[in-house]
Each structure stands twice: as structure tokens, then as C-alpha cells.
A protein has these predicted regions:
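Mid-domain alpha/beta scaffold segments of enzyme catalytic cores
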Residues: 1-202
């Protein structure tokens, strides 16, 4: 049986190198999402011998004005990057002030993914689900791209819209602890469900 973790933060683990060694000798596959383009370049080197670790080219919405939001570097790497994430929007209290910049960057990332195709994209959508869906509806054309909502926290009508767009959903233990999380899980078609740990957070 192959186990697949669709969203974890390998680069944020205290024992990253030890964990990489364990994973590459196991039957487990994982999508190691990144937070910045610079982190991606470093993590690719650490995981170059681990065929079952798929490193994501990320631009986390919480970091878009931190000095690490190097879109030029992102653009130079995306063509050869099959896995994209963590990307998306975060309109929670601590990050709402960068809302317009987040929208511009995420829109650009989706357009780039549509240009190159064959991408697997892990999306952060905290308190911003409707805008994420609007952007996907505007630019999503390639059937070969797989858009995954990580830890979906939107409403049921928003979930239905995301399903209509062909999106996937990675669920984690944190979602099992809330009534709304359980309702979301029950409503997702089984062939659109993926599992994630969100390690080291969930």
C-alpha cells in the first residue's frame, strides 16, 4: 500500500535531514510544500536522491511582503517545477493589509501554471476562499493541472463551486476535530479527497 501525504512542510521540521533519510527508504510519498522560491532551491538539493519526496515551488501568501517574495526567481523556476505550493491567499487579521499584493501574485502564479500545464498546485485559502475560486474561475483552463485546496475552511456553497471547477481537497487531523471540518469532509466526492499531515503544524 502506498501512503501519500499531500501537504507537509519538510523545510520547517527541526530534524529535516533525518526525516528525509527515513522517507526515502520507505513506501511513503509526500508533497513537500515550500514557502519561498529560495527555500525551494535549497530543498531540491536536500531531496535530490529521494524520488518519493516531491518538492513544491512555493510563494506563501503570509510572506508576500517579507522580502522573500521573489517573483522573478519564481518565474525562472516554474517551468521545470511539477509541484507548486504553498501558494494562495490569506485574508486573516494579520495579513489582510497585503490583500491586493496577494491577489496580484496568486493570479500571476495561476496564469503561469496554466501557461505551462501539468502542475500540481497546493492552495492556502484562509478567509479568502471566494477570491481564490474567482481567480481559478477566471484563469483555469488546463485540465492537466490539479488544484488542491489545503485544509479547506470555506462554506458549503463555496465547496460546491470548487468541486465544479474540478478541484481536489487535502484533509488533515485538524479538520476531524471540528463540526464544520467534518461536514466538509463528508461532502467531498471520494475521488477528490487527498490526505495531508500539514506537519509540523497539524
Amino acid at each position: 500500500i502506498m501512503i501519500y501525504d499531500a501537504h507537509c512542510h519538510l523545510d520547517l521540521m527541526d530534524n529535516m535531514l533525518e526525516f528525509i533519510n527515513e522517507i526515502q527508504n520507505s513506501d511513503m510519498n509526500l508533497f513537500a510544500v515550500g514557502t519561498t522560491p529560495k527555500a525551494y532551491s535549497r530543498e531540491i538539493q536536500f531531496c535530490k536522491n529521494a524520488r518519493n519526496i516531491h518538492v513544491g515551488l512555493g510563494m506563501h501568501p503570509q510572506l508576500v511582503s517579507s522580502g522573500y517574495d521573489d517573483m522573478q526567481l519564481f518565474k525562472s523556476l516554474i517551468e521545470k517545477s511539477h509541484y507548486i505550493g504553498e501558494v494562495g491567499l490569506d485574508f486573516s487579521k494579520g495579513y489582510i493589509q497585503t490583500k491586493e499584493l496577494q491577489i496580484n501574485i496568486f493570479s500571476e502564479i495561476v496564469k503561469l501554471c496554466e501557461q505551462y500545464s501539468e502542475k500540481v498546485i497546493s492552495i492556502h485559502s484562509l478567509k479568502s476562499t471566494s477570491t481564490v475560486i474567482e481567480i481559478l474561475r477566471t484563469y483555469k483552463r488546463q485540465k492537466s493541472n490539479k488544484y488542491i485546496f489545503h485544509w479547506f475552511t470555506g462554506s458549503m456553497p463555496q465547496l460546491e463551486k470548487a468541486i465544479e471547477l474540478g478541484c481536489y481537497f487535502s484533509i488533515n487531523p485538524g479538520m476531524l476535530k471540528t463540526k464544520s471540518g467534518m461536514e466538509v469532509i463528508k461532502a467531498i466526492p471520494i475521488d477528490h479527497v487527498l490526505l495531508e499531515t500539514d506537519a509540523p503544524f497539524a
